[in-house]
């Protein structure tokens, strides 16, 4: 049996409409949900994942994931850090609406 995933109402009520309708970026919402699931819903603060990992997990192209990561970072919805040029980035989902 699959585990239930409880989403913060802000994610569905506000962020979804903002990213999809206003920014016209469905891929950013999909990537945000995947990163949120891999971190907060799993009780972790951060996750290391390559663009290829995220693309494979979400069904998006690598370029769509790259654009989504760029958009989410610019909006400060996620943070990304790299230890080196060949190391997968470490992502952190920022719940900025909870401040």
Give the label of every model feature segment.
Residues 1-57, 86:
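Short recognition helix of helix-turn-helix/winged-helix DNA-binding domains
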Residues 61-99:
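Winged-helix/helix-turn-helix nucleic-acid-interaction surface
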């Amino acid at each position: 049996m699959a585990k239930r995933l409880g989403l913060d109402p802000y994610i569905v009520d506000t962020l979804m409409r903002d990213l999809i309708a206003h920014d016209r970026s469905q891929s950013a919402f999909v990537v945000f949900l995947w990163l949120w699931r891999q971190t907060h819903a799993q009780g972790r603060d951060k996750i290391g994942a390559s663009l290829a990992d995220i693309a494979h997990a979400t069904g998006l192209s690598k370029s769509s994931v790259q654009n989504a990561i760029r958009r989410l970072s610019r909006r400060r919805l996620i943070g990304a850090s790299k230890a080196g040029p060949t190391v997968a980035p470490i992502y952190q989902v920022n719940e900025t609406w909870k401040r």
